[in-house]
Amino acid sequence: MIPGEIIAASGDIELNVGAPTVTLEVSNTGDRPVQVGSHYHFAETNGGLSFDRDKARGMRLDIPAGTAVRFEPGQTRSVTLIPLSGKREVYGFRQQVMGKL
């Protein structure tokens, strides 16, 4: 073993097993790319993204931590969302919640 080395278990790692999901169609109506990180409160993303924000309230992308999804101008794509977990409190972002969900 090398100091700092990570030895992962063999086989596939499944993320967010059993978490309820919501799939939404998202369109970038702006003229600039928009990138959304894995743990960003999806309902509070850039206003240039067009989708059902009520369905996205309290949700984040169902992607590995530290990764992101990029929406090019004019692009429409499906995303899968899962609930934010833990205390289910949201602070910051676009300051649209600032407390419990």
From Swiss-Prot:
Main localization category: cytoplasm
List GO BP terms, alphabetically.
urea catabolic process
| SUPFAM superfamilies in UniProt | Urease, beta-subunit
Q: Which GO terms describe its cellular component?
A: urease complex
**Name of one Pfam family that matches:** Urease_beta
Q: Which UniProt key words apply to this protein? A: Cytoplasm, Hydrolase
The yes or no answer to whether the keyword Membrane is present is no
Q: Please state what class of enzyme this protein is.
A: hydrolase
Q: Where in the cell is it found?
A: Cytoplasm
| EC number(s) on file | 3.5.1.5
Q: List the molecular function annotations (GO) for this entry.
A: urease activity
Keyword Cytoplasm attributed: yes
Reaction(s) catalysed by this chain's protein:
urea + 2 H2O + H(+) = hydrogencarbonate + 2 NH4(+)
Q: In which pathway does it act?
A: Nitrogen metabolism; urea degradation; CO(2) and NH(3) from urea (urease route): step 1/1
Share what the entry says about its subunit structure, partners included: Heterotrimer of UreA (gamma), UreB (beta) and UreC (alpha) subunits. Three heterotrimers associate to form the active enzyme.
Which family does this protein fall into?
A: Belongs to the urease beta subunit family.
Q: What is this protein called?
A: Urease subunit beta
Species assigned in the record:
Rhizobium rhizogenes (strain K84 / ATCC BAA-868) (Agrobacterium radiobacter)
